[in-house]
Amino acid sequence: MIPIQNVYYMLSYAFQVLNEQGYKNIATEQFHNTAELMAAILEKGIAIQLKRGLGKEYIPQTEALSSLRGKIDIAESIKTQSTLRKQLICTYDEFSVNSIMNRIIKSTVEILLRSNISKQRKKNLRKLMLYFSEVDFIDLYTVNWNVQYNRNNQTYRMLISICYLVVKGLLQTQSDGSTKLMDFLDEQRMCRLYEKFILE
């Protein structure tokens, strides 16, 4: 079994951001399982991201409006007979924090809150999730993990990668379709995940 402290050092090697000043105190903490380690890294990373501001992106919206906004969907307006109610079906883009990356983070933290981590860590993560109130949950099985990063969302790279490790390492599907949380990542699984990180 790979010691949990070594897992942190492997992650530090893969993500140079963990060597920054804000993450130094994580290196000295003692962790009972990898879920606790991942939760600590996410807690610190989310707090830093919140100081920078949550990433936003344009989300397409379609709704019946009494005033024009964006493009008019004429076919849908006729089909729903919204003109009788003096409304039009409009399609527009809304600049929102409900981005894919924020949804992945919120859903992953929800998994960690149900896992075997300390009460204080759970409390801290719940406090951070208050800032994600406008963010929806996402089914983590359907997520495309090949996220495109640019200058604006580069700070999310490490957070999304940690979320990937949590989802692939802590979720185990049972025969009835429900999921249960594993207490730790077995050695083979951890080696495979780390190899994927090195290759990416």
Which sequence ranges carry the predicted segments?
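Acidic-basic catalytic patches of nuclease active cores, encompassing PD-(D/E)XK
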Residues: 183-199
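Terminal, charged accessory segments of proteins
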Residues: 1-180
